[in-house]
């Protein structure tokens, strides 16, 4: 009823706890799609926040945070994380992930520094592009069977809060 009344077309879920296994999540996804098609006539796109592996799957693979992988300066690690993250997320019938974090960690006291690849724009570009291609696959016209759609997070300015505190204003000069 809620899908029809409010015309819900997408859900971003940041679960408080891990789902116990793939089958449990596949059943949840089947119910969501059933209600969505019944209420709206279209499937619901469902996404999970997965910035360092399949973190909402109890049996999922977790990788080091982006700041740690960025310290290696090796894009193969971003590729492996993206490929594994996509495969394990898709195994739960979840078609969409919120990853990678593309904000530059420019303020050292920002409490979410660990979610970024660091402060270097070139490193950020290389690692993020590599992870995105691994998540979505190489075909730009289609998401593969073992891939998911990816949505970048915190794209611009979130990592430079004036106070250093999370979710506070950023002042970004033109020269930056």
Task: Give the location of each predicted region.
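Glycoside hydrolase catalytic-domain context in secreted enzymes
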Residues: 1-176
